[in-house]
Amino acid sequence: TFNEEILKELNRYFDKEYFDKVYAEAREMNFVINMDLIIGLPNESTEDILRTLDTVKNYDIENLTIHVLALKKGSNLYREGHIHEEIDYEKIEEKITSITETKGLKPYYMYRQKNSLEWGENIGYSVEGKESIFNIQIIEESQSTFGLGGGAITKFTNGAFDEEIELERIVNPKEPLAYIKEMRDRFDKKVKLFKK
């Protein structure tokens, strides 16, 4: 969202002026720009979402990913039984369609998550030829990832497409003291896993 009040409530502090500066620098360096938006944030109305989508129109982007809020079991929102605002999915869908068509963005991947709002699907849109291969590989679990930091997940996969994918996971503790205590052991396990 570009709604600074909602971001503050979520402890996500945002400075649009700084964002625009970094965006302009990335544009100058010919980076492929992706924006990810989450629909269904606490206290976000249909009008808030539509305003955010109107703001997105002002940026020259190659990728847009629309996520629907999924409540993770360990999150405060899940524990507190968060109930999302009633939002007009039809209006939002119309706006997304208008923006993606205007910008020449076409859907190239979709997935669902547990505990997501009724709309439920996450869709990645892209200009042709600028699709994020990383996103596709992560969703397909055909890409190994090395997770660093509290709560990060390392996934090691054989990357097989024509056979059963083998996947091993190592999850870092979220709690800081447990993370620090177990950091060396988990790091060694990850290195061993990637040396296979």
Where in this protein do the model-derived segments appear?
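Conserved non-cysteine loop/helix-boundary elements of the Radical SAM core domain that shape
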Residues: 1-95
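Charged/polar, solvent-exposed surface patches and flexible loops
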Residues: 5-9, 98, 178-181, 185
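Short secondary-structure transition/capping segments
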Residues: 16-22, 43-48, 76-85, 111-120, ...
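Detector for methionine-enriched segments
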Residues: 29, 35, 108-110, 183
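A C-terminal junction/extension of Radical SAM enzymes
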Residues: 70, 74, 78-148
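Radical SAM enzyme core and accessory elements
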Residues: 124-196
